[in-house]
Each structure stands twice: as structure tokens, then as C-alpha cells.
Amino acid sequence: MKKMLFIMNPFAGVKRANRHLADILLTFTQAGYEVITHMTLGQGDATAVAREKGKNVDLVVCCGGDGTLNETISGLLSAGADTPIGYIPAGSTNDFASSLKLPTNILKAAQTIVEGEPVSYDVGRFGNRYFSYVASFGAFTRSSYATPQNVKNALGHTAYVLSGITELSQIRNEHVKMEIDGQTVEGDFLFGAICNSTSVGGILTLDPKQVDMGDGLFEILLVRAPENLGEIHECIQALQSQKYNCAMLTFRSAQKVRIFADPEMPWTLDGEKEDGHETVEVENLHHAIRLRQKKDEDA
């Protein structure tokens, strides 16, 4: 019998997956899997169990938000495991699932995992950590990891928006230098993202035609602080239209980025806090994971 490691965050989102647990497990059992179930107990737990047990099963499935997926992927990669992954998105934002058009219905997502085939995708390595879809700094970065879990559960995605609004008074420019595949970009930026996704924070959407989550390249977006109302309007219009040709924006693709910044500048990796670095290298790991999905969902 095939073995599955099922990792579930019972606190993710509005806890909507919890009431479907029996049906999820039934779906997997009927598909011929012996299911080893692990409920996460706190931050880092999914990484630990994926690292310990991920090599010894045929499939690892995680149920939770972007953070749970990040931890699961991190555990598998740190163990050198090439085990296929299934993902049931049950968080507040689910940017990764949105980019891949994965089912947001819990039971449909479970069915997709057992009926689908492994599709290869890239993963980012940030220093000695991993991220599945984004490493970002600057405006609204803090709201992704500082919003209390009970508020996320009560308000869902709205919690991030409200928390971001309260952060407006704390926004400052960050002086950052980046060596992007041998070219240098330096300046004071309001926001920056190194991503492998069309959705960032559920608010900012990149042009799907310019994003391929399996091409070995990141998309890099840097936003300089507008100095007047005209520049604010121009910047917003460029982001909304997904035409990144205004003076405040830098948008390009790259495989590797070396970053020099204030060591006190915080980052977020897939919505989870990462401490600042004076120097850090970010690298695209081409086809580092295999995610089970139906072919018609392949982004």
C-alpha cells in the first residue's frame, strides 16, 4: 500500500478545513493510501516532521496556508527528499494556490491530489531558507507576519488589508543595492519583491503572461517612493495595468540576486518573518519540487 504523510495546520484560515477532516482522510484512503496524519503544534513543526518522515513516504500532503506549505517544502528540501507534494489551500490568502489556480474547495483539492500528476516548479533559496513564491521587504511586509492568528481566523484575507492600513504610518524607504544576474540596481525603495507568483499578499497581481513558475527565473519588482501626487497616480496606474514602464518601478526576471541592505530591515518569506541581512544571496532552484495537480490546472 502507498504511504502518505498528511500535515495539517488546524489553526489556518478560519479553521475551515477542520470540519472536512474525516472526508479528506476518506478520499485519501479510498485512493489506496495508508495515511500518517500530523497536526502541527506551532511554528516550525511542519518543517520538522517533513524533514523527518518525508523521505519514507510516496506522497506528502499539507493542508493550511502559505506558511504551512513553506514549512513543508523547507523540510523536504533540507532532507534532500524528492517526494511529490499535494497542497490543500486553507489559509487566509493562499497566494501560491491562486497563482496555480488550484482548487480552493477543500474536498475538491483533496480529490485533485489523488487524481493529478506531479508537475515541477521552482523554489527560491534565501540564504539558508526557502520560499515557494515570494521574498519581500518594505511597505506592508510586516502585516503578513504580525497579524495575530485569531484576527486572521476571524477576518480572513481582510485581516491583511486592515493590518496593512494601520502600517501606513510606519512605512519608510529602504536603501537597497541588488546585483541582479550581474547588473546592479541601487536606490531607496518603498517596496521590493523577489517572487515566483502572480499574486503577492492577495493585493498585488503581476501579469500572468510574464510569470512562469517553472522557468528557472524570479520576477523582481522594486517600487521607489513617489515624491508627489502625480507620481503616486502614475505608480498606481502602472501596477494596476501591469505595465511596469514608469520611473518608480523596476521589473525584471533573474535567476540569482545578491542583496546588500540594512541588517535591521525585516523581510517576509511566504508571509513568515525573516530577520534582516546585511548581505544575502537569493537563488532560483529550478524544478525543485513536484506538485500534484490536474493538467488543466497547470499554470
Report each predicted region and the residues it spans:
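Catalytic core of DAGKc-family lipid kinases
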Residues: 31, 40, 78-191
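ATP/nucleoside-binding phosphotransfer catalytic cores, i.e., glycine-rich phosphate-binding loops
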Residues: 180, 186, 212, 222-299
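Short Gly/Thr/Asp-enriched flexible loops that form oxyanion-binding sites at enzyme active sites
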Residues: 68-80
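Glycine-rich phosphate/pyrophosphate-binding beta-alpha loops
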Residues: 136, 140, 193-209, 273
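Gly/Ser/Thr-rich active-site loops/lids in small-molecule metabolic enzymes
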Residues: 151-159, 199, 208-228
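Short conserved active-site loop signatures built around small residues
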Residues: 46, 66, 192
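ATP/NTP phosphate-donor binding region
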Residues: 1-63, 298-299
